C-alpha cells in the first residue's frame, strides 16, 4: 500500500471526471472504473482518504443549477409546467457522485468494491466530516441494491463451494469456528445454516444464521458446539435453536 502523490492525484481527478461525464461509451467507462478501483485498492489509508474526499467535495450537485431549478419549480407550482420543473429540479440535485458509483457496479467485483469502500468511509469519516455526503449517498444506494427482495436465501451445507465455507469461518462473529472439523460439525445432518446472498456477490454471505435441531432447549451453547457430541436424529426434532447469527459486511 502507498500514498497518493500530486501527479497521481491529478490523473485520478481526470479519470473521475471522465467517469462522471460518461464520455466514450459504456466500454470506456467500465475500463476507467476498473483503473480507478485498482488505483484505490493500492492506496494506504491516507491515500484513500484523499481519494474519497475528492469524490465527496468535487462531485456533488452544482449549487447554481440547483438554485435555478428550485426557482423555476417555485414559479411553476401553479402552472401546467409544474411536473416538468419538478423533474428538472430532481435532475439538478442528482450528484455526479451517483454516476461515479454506478460505474463501479459494472465491474465483476464492483458491488463488493463499493461495500468495502463504504467500510473505509465508516473508518475515516470521524477524521474528515467532509466525507459524510459521500457516505450518505452510498448508504442510500446500497440500501436500494441490497433490498431483501433482491437477495437470495440459500442453505449452506458441507457440499457448498469451498470459498463459501471459508467465508463462514472468516465471518463467524458469535462463536469462533476453530477448525474444519468444527465447521463440519455445524453443518451436520442435525444442523442448518442459511445465508442471504446478493446476485453480484455470489460467494459472499451477507448474513448467516446457524441452527441446531433438537428435542429440547439446550442448557448452554457449549453443548451445541461440542464436536464430539452424538449427532441428533433430525426427523425427531421438535425444537430449532438459533445459536449464532453473523452480519458479515461492515459497509
Residue ranges of predicted features:
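Extended, composition-driven regions rather than compact fold-specific motifs
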Residues: 1-251
Amino acid at each position: 500500500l502507498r500514498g497518493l502523490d500530486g501527479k497521481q492525484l491529478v490523473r485520478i481527478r481526470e479519470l473521475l471526471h471522465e467517469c462522471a461525464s460518461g464520455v466514450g461509451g459504456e466500454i470506456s467507462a467500465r475500463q476507467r472504473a476498473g483503473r480507478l478501483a485498482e488505483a484505490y485498492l493500492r492506496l494506504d489509508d491516507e491515500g484513500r482518504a484523499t481519494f474519497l474526499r475528492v469524490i465527496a467535495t468535487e462531485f456533488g450537485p452544482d449549487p447554481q443549477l440547483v438554485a435555478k431549478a428550485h426557482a423555476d419549480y417555485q414559479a411553476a407550482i401553479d402552472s401546467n409546467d409544474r411536473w416538468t420543473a419538478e423533474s428538472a429540479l430532481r435532475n439538478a440535485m442528482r450528484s455526479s457522485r451517483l454516476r461515479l458509483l454506478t460505474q463501479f457496479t459494472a465491474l465483476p467485483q464492483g458491488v463488493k468494491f463499493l461495500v468495502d469502500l463504504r467500510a473505509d468511509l465508516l473508518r475515516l469519516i470521524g477524521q474528515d466530516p467532509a466525507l459524510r455526503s459521500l457516505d450518505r449517498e452510498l448508504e442510500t444506494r446500497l440500501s436500494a441494491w441490497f433490498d431483501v427482495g433482491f437477495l437470495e436465501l440459500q442453505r449452506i451445507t458441507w457440499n457448498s463451494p469451498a470459498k463459501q465455507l471459508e467465508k463462514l469461518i472468516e465471518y463467524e462473529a458469535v462463536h469462533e469456528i476453530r477448525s474444519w472439523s468444527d465447521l463440519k460439525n455445524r453443518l451436520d445432518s442435525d444442523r442448518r445454516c442459511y445465508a442471504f446472498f446478493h446476485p453480484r456477490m455470489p460467494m459472499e454471505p451477507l448474513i448467516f444464521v446457524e441452527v441446531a435441531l433438537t428435542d429440547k432447549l439446550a442448557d448452554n451453547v457449549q453443548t451445541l458446539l461440542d464436536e464430539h457430541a452424538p449427532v441428533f436424529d433430525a426427523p425427531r426434532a421438535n425444537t430449532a435453536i438459533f445459536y449464532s447469527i453473523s452480519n458479515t459486511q461492515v459497509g
